[in-house]
Structures are given as structure tokens and as C-alpha cells.
């Protein structure tokens, strides 16, 4: 390819498709080690300047072979349950492990406390049920709060402050719980909120005002305040200065240690999904290229969110001479990646490169329809690639029955 694309999702490639990518099997994920390191350095610099602590939210990126690139700059990992907590403890040893779950299982708590340093509960009932044992085990105990402050538009599925949300405790819920159990506040070491999704720091400032209004009287008695995730800190144009002011405000006003747990920011624009064209069909006015990669299986957020992932050297439909619809090979009628403006309709066998594919892909993919899991490769700063892991029939089969 002689095309160039210097948009952020493809900047790690230098704006071109390196020849060595043509040699990789498709579909495959390619993680860019240099981009991961740069993201981690930005987050580490924030921590150094402000004294906050930054955690990797493993729900977005959990390719632990790359953890050594991140660990020098981060305080640890954030987990959503037992398995992620164990992964963080094993693969980022010596670092903090924080865990939050909407509801914990009683039969997992004994093992969970072996790995976790901070355990955050979602409700007063779970705090009362498991908090005493967590405290007795020497863990720092927190409660996720719901400041009832929505700052998102159009993505209710990702809004923890949406009406009727199951995530976090409102002030009214907390007051009722304390009235019934006055000893409940004695279990708390910190508060946690997570209300953002791919947002700038102005949304955090708005949320922090709501936290101060609803829960400000509790915070001086806390050791820490966790700002959660959804902060697009490593995105070009992100207002880091405002974020630093928010952190300093919390530290000075309430005397707390501030934690942040970004997921996307750790691996933003640090990965690619490589795919090849299997067939090109024409249905009326619609040109459709069927790929060996599936939206449903290999980039499920495309359907779930939904969104259209960036494609190298492509534009909006109608902005280039041709418009093509890219779709997966599964039997799902809706296995469609999106419509793109391109210079020419791709040919069978052509390599296509999707950007920003390190996040919410390898940790969410699946084998629906018997689709193979893509291999995972890593690309060093020198441009050399190495295989991390590949998958085969056994990985599909043994999720479904006995070995």
C-alpha cells in the first residue's frame, strides 16, 4: 500500500502499512509496544506531578504480556472480580490490586482477599455482609457511590448514573442504610465513583461538584477517593491541566489519596486488527466486502455500543470515490463493521487494518459460529513483530464440553 493515514489510531505505524504486516496471519491483533509505553509514561507523569495513583482497569486491556511496559508507571491494577484480581496480582507483582464488583459471591471472598488490597462494595448490604471479614483480613474497604450526575449523551448503556442504575449507592440509599445500621460507616476507608466513558476532564469536574454536594461531608473521614475510569487522558487534546486541578482539589479539601483507574487511556490507539477480504458482493447499490474478521466475534463493541472502528486510509461514506460496506463471515445478518469511503473497492485478498483495537477486543472476543480466535502479536519500537499467542480448534471445542 502506498497510502498514508496519520490519524491518531494509525500514528503508531508511522502513517503507513509496514511491509512486515503483510506476512502476518489474519485475522490477528497487533499490539504496539511503543504506543503502550507512551500512554503509560503520560499516566506516570500525571502521578508524579500530582501524587495521585493510577491503576490499569483490566476490563479494557488485560494482555498481561505487555504489563511489564506499563508497570513502571502505574500503581497497580483494577479488577472486576476474582479472576482479574488474581491476574493483576500474578502479572504485576508488588503492585496494588483493587477490585470492584456489583455483587460478590460468598464462596469467592476467601480467595479474593488473598489477591486484593482494596475491596470496593456496590451496596450497603454487601458492605455489611463482607466488609467486616475484609477489614479483619487487613484490606482497605470502600463503597461505590452514585452521585446521580449524568454527563453522557446517547449511551445509556455506559451511564452508571442513568435512572434506575444498579451501579453505586445514592445518598438516599446510604442514609437509609446507616439509619438501620449506625456502625456501617466504621467499615469505610474510602469512596469510589465511576461515572465517565471516553470523556474529558470537564465532565470529571462536573461530577466532582456533585460528589462534593452529595457526599462531601463523608470525605474528610476517608483515606482515599477513587475517581474511577472513563478518563481519556492519553487522547490528543485532553485537558490534563483541569484533571490535575480536580485531583489537587480533592487532596487539599478532603485530605484523601486520589486514585484513577483508566482502561482505555492505558491502551488507546495502541493496537490494530488485521483482516483480509474473502469476497466482494454487490446487492443493488451496496458493495459489500466480506472479511475474515467478524464484528460480532472479534470487535463486539462495534455492535454493542455501537460504533464504527477506524479503518486505515478510509473516510466517511461519500467522501471518496467508492463506498464499501465491510462485514464479517458469520451467519449473523447484523455482523456488519460499517460503511466506509475508499479510493477503490478492495480486492479479494487485500489486507485491511483497523485502528484502536487494543481495547475491549482481546478481553471480549468469542467463538460464536465456530469463528477462530485471532492470534495476538506485539510490535516493538524497532518495528519487529513477535507472536504472543495463537489459538486453534481446541480453544473453541473445550469451552463447550469435557476435555
Name each model feature, range by range.
Residues 18-24, 190-194, 228-229:
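A short small-residue
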Residues 5, 9-94, 100-104, 108, ...:
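N-terminal capping/small domains of soluble enzymes
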Residues 200-220, 232-258:
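Extended, folded domain segments that form the structural surfaces/walls around functional sites
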Residues 52-224:
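Active-site-proximal beta-alpha core segment in soluble small-molecule metabolic enzymes
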Residues 194-196, 225-234, 262-265:
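Glycine-rich beta-strand-to-loop/alpha-helix junction loops that act as flexible
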Residues 149-151, 197, 233, 266, ...:
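Feature marks short, surface-exposed loop/turn motifs that line or immediately flank catalytic pockets
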Residues 246, 257-403:
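Charged (often Lys/Glu-rich) extended helix/loop segments that serve as interaction or gating elements
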Amino acid at each position: 500500500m502506498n497510502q498514508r493515514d496519520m490519524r491518531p489510531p494509525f500514528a503508531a505505524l508511522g502513517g503507513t502499512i509496514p511491509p512486515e504486516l503483510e506476512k502476518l496471519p489474519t485475522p490477528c491483533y497487533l499490539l504496539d509496544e511503543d504506543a503502550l509505553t507512551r500512554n503509560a509514561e503520560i499516566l506516570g507523569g500525571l502521578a508524579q506531578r500530582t501524587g495521585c495513583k493510577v491503576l490499569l482497569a483490566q476490563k479494557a486491556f488485560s494482555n498481561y504480556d505487555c504489563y511489564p511496559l506499563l508497570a513502571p508507571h502505574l500503581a497497580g491494577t483494577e479488577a472486576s472480580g476474582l479472576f482479574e484480581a488474581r491476574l493483576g496480582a500474578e502479572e504485576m507483582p508488588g503492585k496494588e490490586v483493587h477490585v470492584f464488583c456489583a455483587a460478590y459471591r460468598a464462596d469467592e471472598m476467601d480467595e479474593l482477599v488473598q489477591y486484593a488490597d482494596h475491596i470496593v462494595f456496590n451496596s450497603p448490604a454487601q458492605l455489611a455482609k463482607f466488609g467486616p471479614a475484609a477489614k479483619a483480613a487487613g484490606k482497605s474497604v470502600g463503597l461505590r457511590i452514585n452521585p446521580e450526575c449524568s454527563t453522557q449523551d446517547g449511551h445509556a448503556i455506559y451511564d452508571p448514573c442513568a435512572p434506575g442504575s444498579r451501579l453505586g449507592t445514592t445518598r438516599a440509599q446510604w442514609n437509609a442504610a446507616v439509619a438501620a445500621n449506625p456502625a456501617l460507616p466504621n467499615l469505610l476507608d474510602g469512596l469510589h465513583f465511576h461515572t465517565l466513558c471516553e470523556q474529558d476532564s470537564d465532565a470529571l469536574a462536573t461530577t466532582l461538584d456533585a460528589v462534593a454536594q452529595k457526599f462531601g461531608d463523608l470525605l474528610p473521614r476517608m483515606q482515599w477517593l477513587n475517581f474511577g475510569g472513563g478518563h481519556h487522558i492519553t487522547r490528543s487534546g485532553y485537558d490534563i491541566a483541569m484533571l490535575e486541578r480536580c485531583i489537587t482539589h480533592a487532596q487539599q479539601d478532603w485530605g484523601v489519596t486520589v486514585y484513577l483507574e483508566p482502561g482505555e487511556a492505558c491502551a488507546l490507539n495502541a493496537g490494530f486488527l488485521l483482516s483480509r477480504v474473502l469476497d466482494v458482493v454487490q446487492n443493488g447499490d451496496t458493495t459489500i466486502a466480506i472479511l475474515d474478521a467478524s464484528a460480532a466475534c472479534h470487535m463486539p463493541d462495534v455492535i454493542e455500543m455501537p460504533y464504527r472502528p477506524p479503518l486505515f486510509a478510509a473516510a466517511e461514506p461519500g467522501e471518496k470515490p467508492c463506498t464499501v460496506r465491510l462485514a464479517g463471515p458469520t451467519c449473523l445478518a447484523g455482523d456488519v463493521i460499517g460503511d466506509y469511503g475508499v479510493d477503490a473497492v478492495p480486492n479479494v485478498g487485500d489486507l485491511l487494518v483497523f485502528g484502536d483495537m487494543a481495547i475491549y477486543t482481546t478481553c471480549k472476543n468469542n467463538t460464536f459460529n465456530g469463528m477462530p480466535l485471532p492470534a495476538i502479536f506485539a510490535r516493538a519500537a524497532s518495528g519487529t513483530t513477535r507472536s504472543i499467542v495463537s489459538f486453534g480448534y481446541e480453544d473453541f471445542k473445550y469451552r463447550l464440553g469435557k476435555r
